[in-house]
A protein has these predicted regions:
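Conserved catalytic-core motifs of GNAT/GCN5-like acyltransferases
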Residues: 71-72, 89-106
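A short, internal acetyl-CoA/4′-phosphopantetheine-binding micro-motif in the GNAT/acyltransferase core
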Residues: 37-45, 72-75
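Conserved GNAT acetyl-CoA-binding A-motif
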Residues: 60-72
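A generic structural signal for beta-strand entry/edge sites
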Residues: 29-31, 67, 96, 107
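Short hydrophobic/aromatic beta-strand or adjacent loop that forms the aromatic wall/cage
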Residues: 8, 105-111
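Short beta-strand-to-coil "C-cap" segments at the C-terminal boundary of structured domains/repeats
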Residues: 100-101, 111-115
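Conserved acetyl-CoA-binding loop-helix of GNAT-fold acetyltransferases
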Residues: 39, 45-58, 81-85
Length: 115
């Protein structure tokens, strides 16, 4: 289940008391790993994932510098566009799933970085 992993930070965006987007972050060494960004199908293409990412970035930046990494499927054009719109860039041709330190050649390693 999305919200059951211990030692993670969760961000939730609600509209009219309905969950429209959620993100799960893991702190790994000196960066955050965006392990999941979920938007239910009926709420997609409304800008909710971008809104949530921007709010998350703002919150993290208020605490200091921000270094967020993520893996996004090379075929998920919507998620790639959302990440880029929010300031992420492709840092690695093959994504790294940091919790297990495994490389996935079907994903890009995305990164958001600001000091």
């Amino acid at each position: 289940d999305f919200f059951t992993l211990p030692e993670n930070t969760y961000y939730v965006l609600e509209k009219d008391n309905m969950l429209v987007s959620a993100a799960r972050l893991s702190k790994i060494n000196d960066f955050y790993y965006l392990e999941a960004l979920e938007t239910p199908p009926k709420y997609r293409k409304k800008g909710y994932a971008s809104e949530l990412l921007n709010e998350m970035i703002t919150h993290l930046h208020q605490q200091g510098s921000v270094d967020i990494r993520d893996c996004v499927s090379k075929t998920n054009t919507a998620s790639l566009a959302t990440h880029k719109k929010c300031g992420f860039f492709i840092a690695e041709e093959n994504g790294i799933y940091y919790p297990s330190n495994t490389v996935n050649n079907k994903t890009y390693g995305m990164r958001y970085f600001i000091r």
